A protein has these predicted regions:
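RNase H-like (RuvC/DEDD) metal-dependent nuclease/polynucleotide-processing core
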Residues: 1-201
């Protein structure tokens, strides 16, 4: 609700949503059938083409079912957000010269590309530090994660007092990399990679 309320007041905006824009349309299943794979391999094809391409590149992502009813709550919330944004006039990135643009992103995939490999576990302290540093080093105006280390003393460490207020939560870091991706799409489009099939979003 807060997101759509904020965006309603914007004349121009590019929004990157960290969720699938729709269900899978069976494109991966059809591709695998053409490649004459075994029925067991085809059964494991419940994903969209974008998810398949990410997995081919070693990036583990959740597959999107073919039915919205079978999708987890976070995916269904994403579908609802896309519908709301489209009703507000947002159009898919690069379709037209629209003032309000929308793109799908995947935070884990973004961090894998930016880190040059699979980053450390997202909820872990070191994973949060790594993600924050990746964004900070790319000029995103956020807290310098290295300040975290300046706040650690022997006393604080012995008492289990960590300056976690200097770090963003995993959810905030996901939102920040999505925003960074949207910014790149507008200002440095040559630095983003488009994957998947337009039929699936």
């Amino acid at each position: 609700e807060d997101v759509t309320a904020f965006l309603a007041g914007q004349q121009t905006a590019t929004v990157a949503v960290n969720a699938p824009s729709g269900v899978n349309r069976g494109l991966v299943r059809a591709k695998l059938k053409k490649e004459m794979l075994t029925p067991h391999q085809v059964r494991r094809a419940e994903m969209r083409m974008a998810e398949h391409e990410l997995r081919v590149h070693g990036i583990a992502v959740s597959g999107t079912p073919a039915s919205a009813a079978l999708c987890p709550a976070w995916m269904q919330a994403g579908f609802e957000l896309y519908r709301k944004l489209e009703k507000m006039g947002f159009e898919k990135l690069f379709e037209e010269e629209a003032e309000l643009q929308l793109l799908e992103t995947h935070s884990h995939a973004c961090y894998c590309v930016l880190a040059g490999g699979v980053p450390l576990s997202k909820p872990s302290l070191e994973g949060r530090l790594q993600r924050q540093l990746i964004l900070y080093e790319r000029g995103v105006r956020i807290k310098d994660p290295m300040d975290f280390f300046e706040e650690i003393t022997r006393y604080k460490l012995s008492k289990g007092i960590w300056p976690t207020e200097l770090l963003y939560s995993p959810e905030q870091l996901d939102a920040l990399v999505a925003a960074y991706t949207a910014w790149l799409a507008v200002t440095k489009a040559e630095n983003i990679i488009m994957i998947g099939d337009v039929k699936e979003g």
